[in-house]
């Protein structure tokens, strides 16, 4: 008797796919001879996290005048120390022109990487599962502004079940910081726009302090608390301006966000506007099941802020630590939290340093380490086991330093709990690549059927 296969509904199929890859990866980990998935610790909780060695880092890279083909590109670096091409660029995929390549993020099933351009508002969708060593561009969204109703500057591309939530930085009316969130399906179809609350339109949210500016930047969620948080930066008129010119423009310096917004995750509605003055950027949430808090850092005031749930179940914001010497404006940029919620890595662009903070007590972070990474540094990504930290250099094309200080690199360091030790560095200018920005990890073990022959299970376990 033949059994008839019944095709499950799409949501169930998505769940089954995620479960299959999780189980496959766990099974591979038991073999001992294969790498299993490692993950950058600041990804969506809707994606499984498994300890192990990552095989690749995908670097979303800005094209640079006079360097190579001058186009934005996705650069794939081999980071598996057992590989013959360890520490080398093994693939590049140019997308045409300069779009102000910035951030990228996987879909929940990790099959596709979405990467945005802050200037052209294009979103490039790469297939990273068919051949993880050689991503393929499968779709370009070119009508983001029109579909969203005027949102400009697609920044964070963040995985929800079957969906991608995209934060905007600006709008097409005044190119200031007023903006919103834009939701798409994993297939790249527009769903809805959610505008960030302002003084003139709070949309039912409670304003708790002095600000309700409507600005946007990053997004993170804690599903168990039905929480979505967004932070705030600045609009197109600022982020596309020369950095020195902007610093000397008093009006421009007033156009920065000062808020973190609490949203109802499931209803997609704003609930509360928290004052976090000084341009709060990346949001990083704790992983512990009972750790109901997240961190952000403020670029202009050089502080670590804790966004936490109090004893009454209300969400609050509190400045808990200084970063370097705030009076010198070190310009905090990217941050990365360890998977055990004990360390927070904070990069500062102006002095090129990374700082490690002990956050065992989230209300009292203590700096325990610092290291100069380069003349400038922006992004940091930590492996799930906390042993590897990756760094890149570029902030924005018009904000990067000039002359010899305009170093463009991708670097790997090992962390032994006491010190960072550099393992390798790739000069993105020497390699004719451009300005290195966002990093995302890849691994063969996510897609067991696609393991190269020399790493196949049967070959090693007859």
Residue locations for each model-derived region?
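Short coil/turn segments that connect the beta-strands within blades of beta-propeller domains
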Residues: 53-55, 109-111, 161-163, 224-226, ...
């Amino acid at each position: 008797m033949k059994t008839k296969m019944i095709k499950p509904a799409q949501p169930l199929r998505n769940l089954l796919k995620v479960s299959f890859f999780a189980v496959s990866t766990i099974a591979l980990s038991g073999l001992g001879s294969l790498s299993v998935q490692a993950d950058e610790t600041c990804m969506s909780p809707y994606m499984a996290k498994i300890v192990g060695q990552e095989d690749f880092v995908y670097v979303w890279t800005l094209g640079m005048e006079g360097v190579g083909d001058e186009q934005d590109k996705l650069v794939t670096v081999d980071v598996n120390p057992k590989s013959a091409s360890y520490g080398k660029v093994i693939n590049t995929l140019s997308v045409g022109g300069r779009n102000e390549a910035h951030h990228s993020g996987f879909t929940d099933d990790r099959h596709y990487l979405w990467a945005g351009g802050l200037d052209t508002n294009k979103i490039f969708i790469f297939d990273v599962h068919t051949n993880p060593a050689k991503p393929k561009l499968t779709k370009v969204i070119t009508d983001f502004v029109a579909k969203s109703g005027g949102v400009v500057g697609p920044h964070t591309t963040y995985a929800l079940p079957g969906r991608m939530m995209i934060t905007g930085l600006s709008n097409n009316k005044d190119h200031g910081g007023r903006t919103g969130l834009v939701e798409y399906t994993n297939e790249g179809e527009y769903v809805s726009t959610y505008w960030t609350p302002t003084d003139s339109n709070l949309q039912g949210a409670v304003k708790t302090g002095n600000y309700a500016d409507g600005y946007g930047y990053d997004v993170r969620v804690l599903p168990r608390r039905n929480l979505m948080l967004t932070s705030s930066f600045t609009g197109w008129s600022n982020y596309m301006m020369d950095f020195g010119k902007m610093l000397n423009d008093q009006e421009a310096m007033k156009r920065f966000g000062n808020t973190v917004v609490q949203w109802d995750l499931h209803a997609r509605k704003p609930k509360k506007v928290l004052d976090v003055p000084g341009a709060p950027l990346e949001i990083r949430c704790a992983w512990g099941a009972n750790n109901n808090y997240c961190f952000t850092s403020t670029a202009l005031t050089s502080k670590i802020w804790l966004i936490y749930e109090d004893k009454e179940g209300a969400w609050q914001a509190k400045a808990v630590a200084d970063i370097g010497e705030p009076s010198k404006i070190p310009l905090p940029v990217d941050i990365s939290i360890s998977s055990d919620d004990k360390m927070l890595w904070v990069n500062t662009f102006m002095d090129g340093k990374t700082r490690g903070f002990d956050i065992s007590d989230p209300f009292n972070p203590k700096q325990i380490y610092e290291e100069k990474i380069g003349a400038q540094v922006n992004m940091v990504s930590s492996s799930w086991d906390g042993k590897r930290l990756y760094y890149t250099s570029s902030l924005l094309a018009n904000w990067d330093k000039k002359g010899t200080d305009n170093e463009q690199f991708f670097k790997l360091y090992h962390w032994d709990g006491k010190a960072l030790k550099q393992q390798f560095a790739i000069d993105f200018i020497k390699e004719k690549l451009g300005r290195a920005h966002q990093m995302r990890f890849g691994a063969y073990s996510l897609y067991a059927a696609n393991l190269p022959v020399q790493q196949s299970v049967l070959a090693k376990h007859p």
